[in-house]
Regions:
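PLP-dependent amino-acid enzyme catalytic core
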Residues: 6-425
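Generic short N-terminal amphipathic or hydrophobic helices
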Residues: 2-3
Length: 425
């Protein structure tokens, strides 16, 4: 194993030992502008759990008044002097849903609504981390490629912190998400091509002009931001973990981060059980799940799903994602676009949670897994909704339908509702 420029005396990260390549094991000092290993592998942040256990307890956390992702600073790779980012990211609600649990034959079911974050998606957790690390690196410009949510989250978090942004999106990105970028003042490049072509263009620009890289599979710190969703779930459940945790999967960064957070908590003794992960992908694009189901290395796939945020045919964080699913003895579940839209409507009508298609893919997978007997009766499950439904209104209308459109006539209203099997009494 090669060790590159490791000097714990000089690093400002007292809780971090190093960054280690998940492919070859090479280690690097955890400097702010880390990217991939020289072998092309993805880096993983390695923590000093003895140091963390000496400085971080459940009692410390219980007494901490900070309802954001930064309440877990001891488990995050940021310098002590780095300020919390301006937007209030994290500490999203975890709703218990007994009605839906009964419908699915589950013992208990919780829905984590990360669509309430500042730019309406879980990606705010990664972007807040990117802003913090860009601050440490002394950067002025942050850039990324994205199918939508990472872009809007970077644009918003960077705007609040005073950074300039360049954001590359495939031209199929929903207009609602692109509108967010423009409102936040991002310099937006709509690329005539798929996500892979968009990613390559962003990588070339970042290398050419030296911008801070917010691309999740290149920057190892971003999954550390995303892992805070699992830290919150554990704390909100009073450290009693469910049997399963379901989440939608695109490039693999989120599910990898979720698993990293759970392992961190297990390593410091905050939890004594690790849930099995449910990796949810669309049948229109499921390269990570296919690798699990066929027990072979992942291969690129075409991108053909309404769940745009997880429509990633070449997942850049596949190595970490596959490790997470396999280590957790997880389940890979593919769902159709029709099942995704049905889950969107089901969540809205039973739980009052409005998620975008990619955001509810985890719930669609839970439903399908229950129906197929992959999840046992009476099991406990957390399903994470990763993005708000207002980001993609066109598909929400496909799911829920149009309102009745009539003249101002109550009798006509009753008549039209009757055609839909709805009464006014």
């Amino acid at each position: 194993m090669n060790i590159i420029t490791l000097n714990k005396e000089n690093t400002m990260l007292k809780n971090v030992k190093c960054a280690r390549c998940v492919r070859c094991g090479k280690e690097y000092e955890a400097v702010p502008n880390l990217t991939n290993c020289s072998c092309g592998g993805i880096l993983d942040i390695v923590y000093d759990y003895d140091y963390i256990k000496a400085h971080f307890t459940k009692e410390t956390l219980k007494n901490r008044v900070n309802p954001t992702m930064w309440r877990y600073r001891e488990l995050l790779p940021v310098e002590e002097t780095t300020p919390d980012t301006p937007l209030r990211v994290g500490w999203s609600p975890l709703y218990e849903e007994p009605k839906l649990a009964e419908m699915l034959g589950l013992g208990r079911l919780w829905v984590k609504d990360d669509g309430i974050n500042p730019t309406a998606s879980l990606k705010d957790r990664a972007s807040a981390m990117a802003v913090a690390k860009a601050h440490e690196a002394g950067a002025k410009i942050i850039a990324c490629s994205s199918t939508g949510n990472a872009a809007s989250s970077l644009a918003g978090n960077a705007a609040a912190a005073g950074f300039k942004t360049y954001i590359f999106v495939p031209e199929r990105a929903p207009k609602g998400k692109v509108a967010q970028l423009m409102i936040f003042g991002a310099n937006v490049i709509s690329v005539k091509g798929n996500y892979e072509e968009t990613f390559k263009m962003s990588a070339e620009a970042i290398e050419k002009w030296g911008w801070y890289n917010r691309n999740a599979a290149i920057n190892p710190y971003l999954s550390e931001g995303k892992k805070t969703v699992s830290l919150e779930i554990a704390e909100q459940l009073n450290w009693e973990m469910p049997d399963y945790l379901a989440i939608s999967v695109g490039d693999g960064c989120t599910i990898a981060g979720v698993w990293k957070g759970l392992k961190d908590l297990y390593a410091i003794g905050f939890i004594d059980k690790l849930p099995r992960l449910i990796s949810a992908q669309s049948t229109g694009c499921y390269p990570i799940n296919r690798a699990i189901q066929e027990n072979k290395p992942w291969e690129p796939m075409e991108e053909n799903t309404i769940a745009d945020s997880i429509s990633v045919g070449v997942p850049r964080n596949a190595d970490k994602a596959l490790m997470a699913i396999r280590e957790s003895n997880g389940i890979a579940v593919n769902v159709t676009d029709e099942e995704i839209l049905a889950a969107q409507k089901l969540l809205g009508r039973t739980c009052g949670v409005f998620g975008e298609p990619a955001g509810v893919t985890g719930t669609a997978a839970v439903k399908k897994a229950c129906e197929q007997g992959l999840i046992e009766k009476g099991a406990t499950v957390v399903s994470v909704v990763t993005g708000n439904g207002l980001k993609d209104v066109a598909n929400a209308i496909k799911s829920a339908g149009e309102p009745i459109n009539i003249k101002p006539d109550l009798d006509l209203m009753v008549e039209e509702f009757a055609k839909r099997g709805v009464t006014v009494e």
